[in-house]
């Protein structure tokens, strides 16, 4: 009986650790899968006016396994190469000037419900400017002769621990970069 008093707390800690790690790992995989699917869609869409809208639809589909309210931010950004990183200002800023200077568009899960007509790079749209205006999809270089652009997708998710034994939450971030698919020869 005394042995059970010593072993039981350790056993429960072990079981809860497996439980927490499993759910955290599921969210981590959800983030990496979402950035991968989203950047592929953005790459294929190239410089069509609704490229960011198509990327958001891909992100919405790929992130279906993530619990509601965990996605904080999705950013589509211009990269200089396959090993580039997202500009640090794009990770946190909502300032139009900062986003335009860094050529990145940011989105939240609320943007999943946007209508496709709300995209198209119009900074003077009513009642709200188009969300893709900071790095307009129609300005992306898709000609082999001109040197193709690289497009990146970044995502940040906060996973809330269920038991609280390992803290309250952990943040997962991931980004993926691909060369924009050529649209013309």
Where are these regions (language model features)?
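N-terminal single-pass transmembrane signal-anchor helix
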Residues: 1-23
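A generic structural signal for ordered alpha-helices
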Residues: 9, 13-16, 33, 37, ...
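Alpha-helical transmembrane segments
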Residues: 23-33
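Short, conserved structural patches
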Residues: 28, 36-185
